[in-house]
């Protein structure tokens, strides 16, 4: 079983690539939450587990993270890109 981790910083439009953003600026959203990310992960078709007490190593504030379970058929980058697209759709 492959378990991928998605931090809100991966999708945050206010961060640069060197600060941790992993998607294109056009796909990023402003201040994504773990709840939005978890909902998007479920929309993509994977199981999501929210861990609110975790923080990304490049950030000082604790924003949590989302564990993506049973993602054996996709790479981490594919999952992050799909989740970013869905978070953008959820915001509209």
Curated annotation (Swiss-Prot):
Entry GO MF terms: 7S RNA binding
Knockout mutant characteristics: No effect on cell growth, membrane protein insertion, protein secretion, or ribosome levels.
Keyword Calcium applies: no
Cellular compartments annotated: Cytoplasm
Pfam families membership: SRP19 (PF01922)
GO biological process: SRP-dependent cotranslational protein targeting to membrane, signal sequence recognition
SUPFAM superfamilies: SRP19
InterPro entries named among the record's database cross-references: Signal_recog_particle_SRP19, SRP19, SRP19-like_sf, SRP19_arc-type
Alphabetized UniProt keyword annotations: Cytoplasm, Ribonucleoprotein, RNA-binding, Signal recognition particle
Residue stretches spanning the membrane: none
Main location group: cytoplasm
Tree of life domain: Archaea
Subunit structure: Part of the signal recognition particle protein translocation system, which is composed of SRP and FtsY. Archaeal SRP consists of a 7S RNA molecule of 300 nucleotides and two protein subunits: SRP54 and SRP19.
Family statement drawn from the similarity comment of this UniProt entry: Belongs to the SRP19 family.
Function: Involved in targeting and insertion of nascent membrane proteins into the cytoplasmic membrane. Binds directly to 7S RNA and mediates binding of the 54 kDa subunit of the SRP.
PANTHER family xrefs: SIGNAL RECOGNITION PARTICLE 19 KD PROTEIN, SIGNAL RECOGNITION PARTICLE 19 KDA PROTEIN
Protein name: Signal recognition particle 19 kDa protein
């Amino acid at each position: 079983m492959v378990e991928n981790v998605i931090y809100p910083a991966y999708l945050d439009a206010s961060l640069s690539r060197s600060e941790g953003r992993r998607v294109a600026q056009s796909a990023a959203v402003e201040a994504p939450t773990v709840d939005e990310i978890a909902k998007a992960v479920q929309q993509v078709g994977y199981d999501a587990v929210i861990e609110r007490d975790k923080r990304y190593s490049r950030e000082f504030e604790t924003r949590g993270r989302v564990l993506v379970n049973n993602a054996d058929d996709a790479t981490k980058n594919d999952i992050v890109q799909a989740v970013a697209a869905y978070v953008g759709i959820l915001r509209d």
